[in-house]
Design a protein with these regions (language model features):
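Short, conserved DNA-binding cores of transcription-related domains
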Residues: 1-95
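Short, positively charged, Gly/Tyr-enriched micro-motifs
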Residues: 2-4, 8-19, 85-169
Length: 169
């Protein structure tokens, strides 16, 4: 989906929310929820388009063609602060003797292998978990993906290991 189509969907969602509000002006909370939902959907889709375009740029890059072969293109879902971002992510194989594999896009944007959360989403989850509970923290993101308490606990433990490694005794 291109950016213009995303903007058209956003404007349609906003205008629909406005129309419903004018039919029932006492229901301001519905307007607020509709606007939030429309803008989050737009933001997540926009991020997906941007990441897919960056992936295409990496795939077509001359320097990449000299050192890597394309193995396959996978659909990736990244849980972010604005919702689930779906994008194409190409799996590459090095042409050198070692022949290691990697997702260049993930390396470029600093995602660890098999990471499910963006940095901002992880901060939101961990902050909420510290304030309330693991269960409540799993509800803070507008994601359709299941986020278990165990996933959150593991993420928190990983973050604590990183912090401890950064500040040795």
């Amino acid at each position: 989906m291109d950016i213009v189509a995303l903007l058209e969907d956003l404007v349609k969602g906003l205008l629909d929310a406005e129309d419903k509000f004018f039919e029932n002006p006492k229901d301001f909370s519905s307007l607020e929820r509709s606007i939030k939902s429309s803008t989050e959907s737009f933001s997540a889709a926009f991020l997906g388009v941007v990441l897919s375009r960056m992936n295409s740029i990496l795939s077509e890059c001359g320097a990449r063609k000299e050192r890597f072969n394309i193995q396959r293109v996978d659909k990736r879902i990244l849980i972010t602060s604005v919702g689930d971002v779906v994008f194409d992510c190409t799996y590459f194989k090095r042409k050198s003797r070692e022949g290691s594999h990697s997702y260049l896009l993930e390396e470029l944007i600093g995602l660890a292998y098999h990471e499910r959360f963006s940095e901002e989403a992880e901060v939101m989850l961990l902050t909420e978990a510290l304030k309330t509970s693991y269960r409540e923290a799993t509800k803070v993101l507008p994601s359709k993906q299941r986020i278990s308490k165990t996933t959150l606990r593991n993420s928190m433990a990983r973050s604590l290991r990183i912090i401890r490694a950064s500040f040795p005794n």
